[in-house]
Structures are given as C-alpha cells and as structure tokens.
Design a protein with these regions (language model features):
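Positively charged, aromatic-accented nucleic-acid-binding surfaces
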Residues: 1-62, 81-122
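Basic, low-complexity intrinsically disordered segments
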Residues: 66-84
Length: 122
C-alpha cells in the first residue's frame, strides 16, 4: 500500500507519473550535520521518521513509534526509485514525539522543523 497525496492505494493502482512525482519531491535537509529527508505536501512537510530518530539518537524502531501516533500523524510514503517506503511523520506527530522525548535537543530540532515547514507551505 502506498500513501500518495493523502490517499492509500495499492502500488499497482498508482500511475507511474504520480509515483515518480512523489519520489522527485523528496527533499534533503541537514540538522546539526545529520541528513533528514522530507516530502513537502500542501498540509506541510512529512519527515522520514527513521531520519528524525537517528538525528536525535533514539534507540527505537520507527515502527514502534508509529504505533504511538495517530494515522493522520504518521503514514507510509514512497521515498525512493526502487519502491522504497518509509514511515513519515507530519508536524503534529513530530511535536508529539518531541514533547515526550525528554531530549535536550528537542526544542532546537522543533525550531529547525518549523523553518522547513514555513518553506513548504504555499
């Protein structure tokens, strides 16, 4: 299943041009030298959860974090040409994750993410 522009569909049901558009929309940004991939959407950026967890030195799998978030806060998205799928989190889910993290870097990361958000909203 692929979540593309807010709709979950079987990969075979998604036209190739839409899949490629999603893949081409993956952006890279750096926070304290660590790569964070995100997908700009109309409702704001969707950050690759594994990148966020890695940047903040979390020792938990993205699939475990996803269970603690609502469906509208975390979804599986296409991020690579070779059919790579990743759990991605929106700003609401990111805020929830960071507010319970206890990580001293959390406020700085959230501020950085809000700057990304400002640049993705039209």
């Amino acid at each position: 299943m692929v979540n593309l522009h807010g709709a979950t569909r079987k990969r075979s049901e998604v036209p190739l041009d839409q899949l490629l558009e999603s893949v081409w929309n993956v952006r890279d940004a750096r926070w304290q030298g660590k790569l964070i991939r995100y997908i700009p959407e109309n409702d704001g950026p969707w950050f690759v959860l594994a990148d966020v967890l890695g940047a903040l030195d979390y020792k938990v799998k993205p699939s475990h974090v996803k269970k603690a978030l609502r469906t509208e806060e975390c979804r599986l998205m296409e991020i690579g040409v070779k059919s790579a799928l990743a759990n991605c989190v929106n700003m609401t889910g990111l805020l929830k994750l960071l507010s319970f993290s206890g990580k001293p870097e959390a406020p700085a990361f959230l501020e950085w993410a809000r700057e990304i958000e400002k640049g993705t909203r039209g």
